Curated annotation (Swiss-Prot):
Its EC number is 2.7.11.1. May play a role in the regulation of plant growth and development. May be involved in plant defense signaling. Belongs to the protein kinase superfamily. Ser/Thr protein kinase family. It comes from Arabidopsis thaliana. It catalyses: L-seryl-[protein] + ATP = O-phospho-L-seryl-[protein] + ADP + H(+); L-threonyl-[protein] + ATP = O-phospho-L-threonyl-[protein] + ADP + H(+). It is found in: Cell membrane. ATP binds at residues 74-82, 106. The active site is at 203 (proton acceptor). GO terms for biological process: defense response. This is Probable serine/threonine-protein kinase PBL11. Keywords: ATP-binding, Cell membrane, Kinase, Lipoprotein, Membrane, Myristate, Nucleotide-binding, Palmitate, Phosphoprotein, Plant defense, Serine/threonine-protein kinase, Transferase. CDD domains: STKc_IRAK. A lipid is attached at residue 4 (S-palmitoyl cysteine). Residues 68-353 form the Protein kinase domain.
């Protein structure tokens, strides 16, 4: 864990008296198989008892983090603070700094029922879910008013920090690294959506994508996740929660939540990876504060796309490959939720881009390559045809 999380839209989730059980089969890295689990009402005690997690004592976590010393803080946000600590790899007992395995301990602010609900939801989902592109929750602590979560430590921090912070510690991410991160995050979402019933992540954003030492992307913070619709229902109805700039328009307008809401958020992050811009940035010129609204007209035109592309990526990519991702992002942010691709379809496209080498045909006739990209997209066909530079 590299940090806490940015401010969410300040509204409450619809109240519920239960959180459903998750008994998910372990899955491969592509996230394309179907996971199944039982579905039943569960109390807080049942959730904690059935989670595949260690129940840490407060004294153990104090020892692991050197009594939550200020210089152990690695992140801070609405949930509380995140501290760096160490535990023994075998026994999971506290160990001396620099020995054993590194952990991230997230301590809940001791106020508010919503924070407790999110803490419990995190245990309910990550206590049962297991996938290479989901951050690993090791354990929890519940003592009187103290509520903490213990995760694997994500050495590289968040995607948000690497994309938007400047300085010697955060070097610009290369094109290939960005594509690989997008693929990893897509696999994590696909795994959630392939569960029966589906799991809707609901807060997909750059700050919730954490990176290990090899820059592998993992989804974190399941406090807002919830089960998808059952039976013939197309959505679940909730009060709106999420992060400004990432939430799907139909969800903001109606509270109707589906897996296609996550797809929209994925499209926003794709645009952030392409542009190096935040989803919402009031420091940009007037008319460019909202990344989706500003970028949308440029995503199917080769010449115009250059205006969107992060200048730090110059010389690292072909415009044809960049256009494929831009068109994919355009499909994801479609106003019509039904026309957005599934995460399985997105994973397939991203895998092709990840392994694709520069094709000689692109150099010979780039217009043919671009036409093929445009014709395959239900959104791009409605935009002006690109011209060749």
């Amino acid at each position: 864990m590299g940090g806490c999380f940015s401010n969410r839209i300040k509204t409450d989730i619809a109240s519920s008296t239960w959180l459903s059980s998750k008994f998910l089969s372990r899955d491969g890295s592509k996230g394309s198989s179907t996971a199944s689990f039982s579905y039943m009402p569960r109390t807080e005690g049942e959730i904690l008892q059935n989670a595949n997690l260690k129940n840490f004592s407060l004294s153990e976590l104090k020892s692991a983090t050197r009594n939550f010393r200020p210089d152990s803080v690695v992140g801070e946000g609405g949930f509380g603070c995140v501290f760096k600590g160490w535990i023994d790899e075998s026994s999971l007992a506290p160990s001396k700094p620099g020995t054993g395995i590194v952990i991230a301990v997230k301590r809940l602010n001791q106020e508010g029922f919503q924070g407790h609900r999110e803490w419990l939801a995190e245990i309910n989902y990550l206590g049962q879910l297991d996938h290479p592109n989901l951050v690993k929750l090791i354990g929890y602590c519940l003592e009187e008013e103290h509520r903490l979560l213990v995760y694997e430590f994500m050495t590289r921090g968040s995607l948000e920090n690497h994309l938007f912070r400047r300085g010697t510690f955060y070097q610009p991410l290369s094109w290939n690294t960005r594509v690989r991160m997008a693929l990893g995050a897509a696999r994590g979402l696909a795994f959630l959506h392939n569960a029966q019933p589906q799991v809707i992540y609901r807060d997909f954003k750059a700050s919730n994508i954490l990176l290990d030492s090899n820059y592998n992307a993992k989804l974190s913070d399941f406090g807002l996740a919830r089960d998808g619709p059952m039976g013939d229902n197309s959505h679940v109805s909730t009060r709106v929660m999420g992060t400004q700039g990432y939430a799907a328009p139909e969800y903001l307008a109606t509270g109707h939540l589906s897996v296609k809401s996550d797809v929209y958020s994925f499209g926003v992050v794709l645009l952030e990876l392409l542009s190096g811009r935040r989803a919402i940035d009031k420091n940009q010129p007037v008319g460019e504060h909202n990344l989706v609204d500003w970028a949308r007209p440029y995503l199917t035109n080769k010449r115009r796309l250059l205006r969107v592309m992060d200048p730090r990526l110059q010389g690292q990519y072909s415009l044809t490959r960049a256009l494929k991702i831009a068109v994919l992002a355009l499909d994801c942010i479609s106003i019509d939720a039904k026309s957005r691709p599934t995460m399985n379809e997105i994973v397939k496209t991203m895998e092709e881009l990840h392994i694709q080498k520069e094709a000689s045909k692109e150099q010979q006739n780039p217009q043919i390559s671009i036409d093929n990209i445009i014709n395959k997209s239900p959104q791009a066909v409605n935009y002006p045809r690109p011209s060749i530079m």
